[in-house]
């Protein structure tokens, strides 16, 4: 059963939240003066509504500290540390004209609300080895959108093409299955203005909808969420000896931005990661890792928020777990083993931890299944583990050979 989606503003009087007979639960985003401060999912057990009283108690428990912190931040507002940058927003896509249309409509709605003295964002659509002209036709409906075609198939080929075409001081990436929040520009601007030395920025990513079992399972396991506290990441992370190798520290590639000149100086994205169906993952984690290892700060800013359309069916979700989160992640770690001798022991420890953690997770959900408790389908977790095994056993080397062949065929 689906989860009803609610977007609440705490400075407005709370009301009962109505639920239909089709709603198995509710997903609630809480804001204070448009700033996101909390998100949670809760089962509703056939109830007709969530009362305002129950809602107030839940908000106090989940968001009370953040609401107070936001009120203090508002009172102690400090001047911007540096001028607003010019921004290129890149949409790398392949054969998804519907998603591109939705994203462009939402993006230009946000752009129209910017202050008149703000730099006008540069919007770039990178069409990655398309099978037809539908995306070019979509981009052509927007007079200010630039369209380029990247003939070499693979997301990181498209990202590197965006880097070469970028005109902005900041290059932001939005996937074609997201839409930006109304505070997206303000969030990016706030992160930049108080972290002028940072080279990368990531933001909160919440579900666009929770209509299917696959979407609900994905979000219950954590989705792409990273919390509602701004985090500035540097060379070390106190208490985490595996840093910066893990996946949970940085944010998601669906919504990220970089200082363009730093991205260029680092050589752009590794085209042997995020190569499409063969290795559909790891490319965002790799560039985050390399930025940190090069000595640049990375800032996670929850106000820099987007909404993601999760995979709708279980087959799609299974492929995501197996290939993106298993194979892609382990290919990224294998690369780190090869290329970063100084951190090799830590990366090896992370690989061991990953397999142990996911094995324990699988066993835990098998027990829940036997007890008829709510659980993640074991087949998803087995697929993720198997993807990790395939990635560890030469996945990155095979991908490099494939990419070399693509470069020979399409210079």
Which residues are covered by each model-predicted region?
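A conserved acidic beta->alpha catalytic loop
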Residues: 106, 124-136, 178
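Short, well-formed alpha-helical segments that are part of the catalytic scaffolds
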Residues: 96-111, 115
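A short, conserved alpha-helix in the catalytic core of glycosyltransferases
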Residues: 249-267, 272-304
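Short aromatic/hydrophobic "clamp" motif used to bind/position activated sugar donors
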Residues: 171
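Conserved donor NDP-sugar-binding/catalytic core segment of glycosyltransferases
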Residues: 183-223
């Amino acid at each position: 059963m689906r989860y009803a989606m609610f977007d609440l503003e705490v400075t407005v009087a709370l009301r009962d939240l109505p639920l239909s007979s089709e709603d198995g639960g509710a997903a609630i985003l809480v804001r204070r003066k448009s700033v996101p401060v909390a998100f949670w999912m809760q089962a509703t057990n056939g109830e007709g509504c969530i009362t305002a009283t129950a809602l107030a108690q839940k908000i106090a428990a989940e968001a009370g500290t953040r609401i107070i912190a936001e009120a203090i931040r508002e009172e102690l507002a400090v001047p911007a540390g540096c001028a607003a940058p010019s921004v290129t927003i890149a949409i790398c896509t392949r054969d998804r004209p519907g998603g591109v249309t939705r994203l462009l409509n939402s993006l230009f709605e946000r752009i129209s609300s910017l202050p008149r003295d703000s730099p006008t964002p540069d919007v770039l659509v990178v069409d990655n080895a398309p099978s037809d002209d539908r995306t070019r036709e979509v981009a052509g409906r927007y007079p200010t959108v630039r369209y380029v075609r990247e003939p070499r198939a693979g997301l990181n080929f498209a990202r590197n093409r965006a880097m070469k075409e970028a005109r902005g001081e900041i290059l932001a990436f939005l996937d074609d299955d997201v839409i930006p929040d109304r505070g997206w520009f303000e969030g990016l601007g706030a992160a930049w203005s108080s972290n002028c030395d940072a080279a990368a920025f990531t933001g909160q990513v919440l579900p666009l909808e929770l209509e299917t079992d696959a979407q609900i399972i994905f979000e219950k396991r954590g989705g792409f969420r990273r919390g509602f506290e701004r985090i500035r990441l540097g060379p070390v992370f106190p208490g985490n000896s595996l840093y910066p190798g893990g996946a949970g520290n940085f944010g998601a590639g669906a919504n990220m931005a970089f200082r363009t000149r730093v991205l260029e100086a680092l050589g752009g994205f590794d085209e042997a990661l995020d190569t499409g169906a063969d290795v559909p993952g790891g490319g965002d984690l790799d560039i985050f890792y390399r930025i940190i290892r090069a000595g640049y700060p990375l800032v996670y800013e929850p106000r820099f928020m987007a909404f993601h359309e999760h995979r709708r069916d279980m087959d799609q979700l299974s492929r995501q777990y197996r290939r993106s989160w298993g194979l892609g992640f382990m290919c990224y770690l294998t690369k780190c083993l090869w290329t970063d001798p100084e951190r090799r022991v830590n990366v090896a420890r992370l690989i061991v931890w990953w397999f142990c953690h996911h094995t324990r997770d699988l066993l835990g959900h098998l027990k829940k299944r036997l007890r008829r408790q709510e659980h993640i389908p074991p087949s998803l977790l087995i697929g993720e583990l198997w993807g990790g095994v395939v990635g560890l056993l030469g996945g990155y080397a095979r991908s490099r050979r494939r990419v070399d062949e693509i470069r020979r065929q399409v210079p």
